[in-house]
Regions:
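Conserved acidic segment of CheY-like receiver
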Residues: 3-14, 19-23, 55
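Acidic, metal-coordinating helix/loop segments flanking the phosphotransfer/catalytic sites
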Residues: 36-54
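Conserved phosphotransfer cores of two-component systems
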Residues: 47-50, 75-81, 102
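Conserved phosphotransfer microenvironments
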Residues: 51-75
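Conserved phosphotransfer active-site motifs of two-component signaling proteins
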Residues: 61, 90-94
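A short, hydrophobic beta-strand element within the central beta-sheet of small alpha/beta folds
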Residues: 81-91
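Short, flexible helix-to-coil linker/hinge segments that flank and couple to helix-turn-helix
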Residues: 97-100, 109-146
Length: 146
């Protein structure tokens, strides 16, 4: 099942436009909405009756908030069928180690080529989890080291 309705949560609005262009190359029905933070997504009445298939959480920060697992759980509670993709500028091996337990379905580096982002979308569409090439290489080479 292709994720048709996608929410991008990122401090940079252009990310949502880029994602829509990438995803529409494989799914012309893909519609991307944007908000600048997780708390807006959780609290806003705008999203009250929205059923997102995929939620992309982006960050330029070196680390995600410590309460990321709780935030992912809240997002999955509000948007029940949503898959969660982290779109990060920096590597955190703990995210990979805890992906299954925390409900994160994909972990992608922000500087991966467009083909890698498209591949992630296709893997999520197939019901699979995915770790992008850069992060997978870092994890297999360095494990829990930074």
């Amino acid at each position: 099942m292709n994720p048709d309705k996608i929410l991008v949560i990122d401090e940079m609005p252009i990310v949502s436009l880029a994602m829509q262009e990438i995803f529409r190359t494989v799914n012309t029905a893909a519609v991307v909405e944007y908000t600048d933070n997780i708390f807006t997504a959780l609290a806003s009445k705008v999203y009250e009756n929205s059923g997102f298939d995929l939620i992309i959480i982006g960050s330029q920060e070196d680390v995600f908030p410590e309460n990321l697992p709780e935030l992912v759980e809240e997002l999955k509670g509000r948007f029940r069928k949503a898959r969660i993709m982290l779109f990060a500028a920096s590597y955190n091996p703990a995210i990979i180690a805890e992906m299954d337990r925390s409900g994160i379905d994909a972990y992608v580096h922000k500087y991966e080529p467009l083909a890698e982002i498209r591949k992630t979308y296709l893997r999520l569409s197939a019901g699979e989890s995915y770790i992008s090439e850069i992060f997978r290489t870092l994890y297999s080479e360095y494990g829990m080291k930074k």
